């Protein structure tokens, strides 16, 4: 008897999406798809529209045109609270003005499941502590977030998203302000999340990180538009040279052939 593999479930797709702000269109004709348990890395130069694309997918910025569909339903039909139960956002590690304990920062991921008058329950605290344990940072639970290192802060923000129990995590340059060791630690944790049936969209400036993480790549550029595909076909020196306005020869020199070797 032949047992066929289970078909992947489509989580997110865009239909002729146009993105921009204040009425100005940055990129249009975006046909994007994301399946469950898929990592998609988003590459583009500064000002290409990466952050605008992510904000639009998160429902924080309205599209200029087209539609975004989450599990067969238009994103516009979800309330912000409903959407937060499905999609979590992981920003870059940042300083915080208020002295929150790490466990309290992570418990904020449970806010989408609470009424405005409710306080977190023991079950919410348990989920927060489980998320910290999962990332091997449970020892930070009683530390103050603002006193942590950049790498520790980034892992706490990822733990907050895990506590949110979302099916999709959207990360905006999660390693941009980290030293090399912390970059490696964060990247390894991201790979582990995929094994837990979590889909991820990750914006990065680093093609080598995209080659390591992504089974799917998006190239975003105002001149060349939107391209999505597997890394073998898209993550080439020629394509990178186009979006970063440089030459394939210089890229080859500075990347030490890592892109080609990774394929």
Swiss-Prot record:
Q: What is this protein called?
A: Uncharacterized ABC transporter ATP-binding protein HI_1272
One cellular-component annotation, GO: ATP-binding cassette (ABC) transporter complex
Name the source's superkingdom: Bacteria
Under the heading Pfam families, the entry gives: ABC_tran
Q: Which InterPro entries match?
A: AAA+_ATPase (IPR003593), ABC_transporter-like_ATP-bd (IPR003439), ABC_transporter-like_CS (IPR017871), Metal_Ion_Import_ABC (IPR050153), P-loop_NTPase (IPR027417)
Spell out the family assignment given in the record's similarity comment: Belongs to the ABC transporter superfamily.
CDD domains in the cross-refs:
ABC_Iron-Siderophores_B12_Hemin
Species of provenance: Haemophilus influenzae (strain ATCC 51907 / DSM 11121 / KW20 / Rd)
What GO molecular function annotations does the UniProt record carry, in alphabetical order? ATP binding; ATP hydrolysis activity; ATPase-coupled transmembrane transporter activity
Question: Which part of the chain is the ABC transporter domain?
Answer: 12-247
Keywords from the named record: ATP-binding, Nucleotide-binding, Transport
Where is ATP annotated to bind?
44-51
Q: Is Nucleotide-binding among the key words of this record?
A: yes
């Amino acid at each position: 008897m032949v047992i066929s593999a289970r078909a992947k479930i489509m989580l997110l797709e865009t239909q002729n999406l146009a993105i921009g702000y204040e009425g100005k269109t940055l990129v249009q004709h975006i046909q994007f798809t994301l399946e469950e348990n898929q990592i998609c890395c988003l590459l583009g130069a500064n000002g290409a529209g990466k952050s605008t694309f992510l904000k639009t997918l998160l429902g924080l910025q309205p599209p200029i045109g087209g539609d975004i569909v989450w599990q067969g339903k238009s994103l516009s039909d979800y309330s912000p609270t409903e959407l937060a139960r499905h999609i979590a956002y992981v920003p870059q590690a940042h300083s915080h003005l208020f002295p929150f304990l790490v466990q309290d920062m992570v418990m904020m991921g449970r806010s989408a499941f609470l009424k405005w008058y409710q306080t977190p329950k023991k079950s919410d605290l348990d989920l927060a502590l489980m998320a910290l344990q999962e990332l091997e940072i449970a020892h930070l639970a009683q530390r103050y977030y603002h006193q942590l290192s950049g790498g520790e802060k980034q892992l706490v923000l990822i733990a907050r998203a895990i506590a949110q129990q979302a099916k999709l995590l959207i990360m905006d340059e999660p390693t941009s302000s980290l030293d090399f060791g912390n970059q490696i630690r964060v990247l390894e944790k991201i790979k582990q999340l995929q094994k837990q049936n979590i889909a991820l969209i990750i914006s990065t400036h680093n093609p080598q990180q995209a080659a390591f993480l992504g089974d799917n790549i998006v190239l975003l550029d105002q001149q060349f538009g939107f391209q999505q595909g597997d890394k073998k076909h898209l993550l080439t020196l020629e394509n990178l040279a186009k979006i970063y306005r440089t030459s394939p020869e210089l890229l080859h020199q500075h990347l030490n052939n890592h892109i080609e070797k990774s394929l």
